[in-house]
């Protein structure tokens, strides 16, 4: 069975170390893989995976990715899911004036994000598709 993992720590965890200890406990209780909370900064994912390996976490940690599909998500998603937006993405996000702008940015950023994940050895990616199924379909085409 799969469990959740939080590269930027769960909002209720006092710190990342405690959150990772909790993930280790999940593994020790039989978890076979983990899917991360969404993130926009791949370095946070890779750092998390490295620390997990140092703690003896050996289950696959599948990155969870969500593209923006609407203008409102640019501000809502990072706040709701407690994830940081890299400066480069934030700089582009402020230029978005319409849902179409946000959707295009979401496809562009997420495609690049996935390409980097694959290039650095990630085998699987989980897409959070709520309000973004068309975007995810386009990203999948971009990755072919």
Question: Over which residues does each language-model region extend?
Answer:
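A structural motif corresponding to the C-terminal end of an alpha-helix
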Residues: 29, 113-124
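A cross-taxonomic marker for long C-terminal extensions/tails that follow the last structured domain
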Residues: 110, 118-119, 127-132
């Amino acid at each position: 069975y799969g469990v959740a993992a939080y590269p930027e720590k769960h909002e209720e965890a006092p710190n990342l170390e405690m959150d990772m200890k909790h993930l280790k406990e999940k593994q020790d209780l039989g978890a076979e893989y983990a899917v991360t909370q969404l993130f926009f900064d791949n370095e946070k994912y890779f750092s998390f995976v490295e620390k997990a390996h140092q703690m003896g976490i050996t289950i696959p940690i599948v990155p969870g990715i969500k593209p923006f599909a609407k203008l409102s998500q640019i501000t809502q998603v990072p706040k709701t899911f407690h994830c940081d937006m890299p400066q480069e993405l934030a700089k582009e996000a402020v230029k978005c004036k319409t849902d179409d702008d946000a959707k295009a940015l979401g496809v562009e950023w997420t495609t690049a994000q996935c390409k980097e994940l694959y290039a650095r050895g990630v085998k699987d990616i989980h897409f959070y598709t709520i309000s973004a199924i068309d975007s995810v379909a386009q990203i999948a085409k971009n990755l072919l």
